[in-house]
A protein has these predicted regions:
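N-terminal secretory signal peptides that target proteins for export/translocation
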Residues: 1-6
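N-terminal secretory/targeting leader peptides
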Residues: 30-128, 138-353
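Core domains of carbohydrate- and sulfate-ester-processing enzymes
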Residues: 132-136
């Protein structure tokens, strides 16, 4: 009887231990519902906010069985774009699509993000995908962001970078005195060739052009359509300076670490899908704009010569990369490594000697 009693007691402890293990197991923890805030870089009505990001949010909620719910907030609703980085670090917001170039002063790898590359580095979606996702640039940036308390979900294609104007800009020579809203290396390029670049949030640009504060603007092609810049800028200048422009998907490390591994894997997969989906929709809708909307709006497409493209590449873009390596490289060796990767890529494609 004593043996039987001991066996029964042991079985009770085993069963209790089993249920305790279940209650503490990842499977039980996985039942927790997480609520995230997404701060978008773009405004309501834009391609990302109306299509791309909502699809991401819906996909993640469905794939997690409702365990991760994300609420989208438009540009400036939670914090201004300049405050997204510290807000992520503090876990005030949990996820953001933004441009790391805005913090290139404090995070050196911001200088080698796709959004900050000078003109004519990559010249197709496939080239961008190769350079960032397969030649190691995203890996370098992920390491740097981790040191800042931010988890990096990769660079994503947001469409080609053009600029547009109230007056014809037929060549580089016409840039002198041109007051333009631009960003990062695009602003640096404009300044090099005599223009006067200004950085303004997207919602303020239309009025600035209307009142004469600006002569034009430059960014992703769809901003021309979605912000109705065609009403104030009838001249649209190509070829695109960045093919494509890209941004980064950043997550608060604190929020990331709180997630079960399966939800982390779902987010990683959803980020890859988002980049591909963004690239596809960009190509489809951009061509629709040229084919159907330009005639209706009265927009004139001005195509610069190959000579201008070659001059920008050799006179500005290549020296700019070397300057970044020399001046920013000592702050983070990943910047030097990144520039080496970029220049080798350009040699492989015959863009530089």
């Amino acid at each position: 009887m004593k043996v039987r009693s001991l066996l029964l007691t042991g079985m009770v402890f085993v069963i209790l231990g089993f249920f305790a293990a279940i209650s503490l197991s990842p499977a039980a923890a996985a039942d927790e519902v997480f609520h995230w805030k997404w701060q978008a870089h773009q405004t309501a009505g834009s391609l990302p906010c109306e299509t791309i990001i909502p699809r991401f949010i819906k996909r993640v909620e469905e794939m997690t069985g409702g365990r991760l719910k994300i609420t989208l907030h438009y540009a400036g609703e939670l914090v201004e774009y300049t405050e997204v980085f510290p807000a992520l670090q503090a876990n005030m917001i949990q996820i953001a699509n933004t441009g790391a170039l805005f913090w290139r002063g404090s995070v050196p790898v911001g200088w080698i993000t796709a959004g900050n590359l000078p003109p004519f580095i990559t010249r197709s979606d496939a080239e961008f995908n190769e350079l960032y996702h397969h030649r190691g640039l995203d890996k370098l940036m992920g390491e740097a962001w981790a040191e800042q308390g931010i988890h990096f979900l990769g660079s994503h294609n947001v469409g080609d970078t053009y600029f547009w104007s109230k007056k014809p800009i037929n060549s580089l020579e016409d840039l002198k005195g041109f007051k333009v809203r631009f960003f990062g290396a695009m602003s640096d390029t404009m300044e090099h060739f005599g223009a006067s670049p200004i950085m303004l949030p997207h919602p303020e640009v239309y009025m600035a052009i209307s009142t004469g504060t600006l002569d034009g603007a430059g960014t992703c092609w769809w901003q021309y359509r979605d912000l109705k810049h065609y009403e104030v800028c009838p001249y649209y200048i190509g070829p695109p300076w960045q093919v494509p422009q890209a941004m980064e998907l950043l997550v608060s490390q604190k929020a990331w670490d709180a997630l079960p591994r399966d939800i982390q894997a779902i987010l990683e997969t959803a980020a890859i899908v988002m980049s591909k989906e963004f690239a596809d929709l960009n190509r489809i809708e951009e061509q629709e704009m040229y084919r159907e909307s330009f005639p209706k709006w009265g927009t004139k497409f001005i195509q610069w010569s190959e000579g201008d493209v070659d001059r920008i590449t050799k006179e500005f873009s290549l020296p700019y990369l070397d300057k970044i390596a020399a001046e920013v490289g000592p702050k983070d060796p990943r910047v030097v490594k990144g520039i080496e990767i970029i220049k080798q890529f350009m040699r492989d494609y015959g863009y530089i000697d």
